[in-house]
A protein has these predicted regions:
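Residue-level signature of catalytic and energy-coupling elements of molecular machines
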Residues: 9, 23, 68, 109, ...
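Transmembrane alpha-helix boundary/anchor motif
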Residues: 21, 25, 31, 112-116, ...
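Hydrophobic membrane-targeting segments
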Residues: 1-42
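Predominantly long cytosolic amphipathic alpha-helical stalk/bundle segments
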Residues: 36-127, 158-183
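Alpha-helical transmembrane segments of integral membrane proteins
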Residues: 12-25, 99-106, 149-153
Length: 183
């Protein structure tokens, strides 16, 4: 492992930063996109059973609770849907950075590969053994680390996007139920 990190040279810093940022974003978004934080069962059940009045101030901490509060304050129709879209945009926070890491980490690895290959060809003659080893090590290490950052980030991004889609569907049902109640 130490050889891999040393072989990556200066490219280890941006790749390490991408790795830590991705880990932070994955954990933070996984915690933020829990059902209990977005659309708790108690709030959804109260609305779907035709009793949104039972949703209390304590439920206002969740996205669904805030939407019910807006409905109680008189928001309806397009206004309520606009608030739901606003909340969904807030839930997407940070996912664009994770997408950038998925795309950028392999490119940083590729840049390291190019730098390693460039080191193989000195201005004159053939490279010596040390230069050859260092260049190949840089090329392989940065590629491997870039992929090791990107692949788990890609899997997490897909999981979070699916999670967001499911929660969005729950909120759509909630808004439609509130709208039907208003009519």
């Amino acid at each position: 492992m130490q050889t891999l990190i040393q072989g990556a040279g200066a490219f280890i810093w941006p790749l390490g930063f991408c790795s830590f940022l991705a880990l932070f974003l994955i954990i933070e978004r996984a915690l933020a996109l829990r059902v209990s934080k977005v659309a708790p069962e108690s709030v959804v059940k109260s609305v779907l059973t035709g009793q949104p009045e039972l949703v209390g101030a304590a439920d206002g901490e969740s996205v669904a609770g805030r939407l019910v509060q807006r409905w109680k304050d008189g928001a309806s129709g397009e206004v309520l849907k606009a608030w739901a879209r606003h909340e969904l945009i807030r839930l997407q926070r940070g996912l664009h950075l994770l997408d950038s890491i998925v795309a950028g980490a392999p490119l940083l690895g590729l840049l390291g590969t190019v730098a390693g290959r460039a080191a193989l060809f000195p201005e004159q003659g053939l490279p010596d053994t040390v230069t050859l080893t260092r260049g190949v090590g840089l090329a392989l290490s940065t590629t491997m680390i870039g992929l090791c950052v990107a692949i788990p980030s890609l899997l997490a991004t897909n999981w979070l996007a699916r999670r967001l889609e499911i929660l969005s569907s729950r909120l759509d049902v909630l808004v439609e139920a509130l709208e039907a109640r208003r009519r």
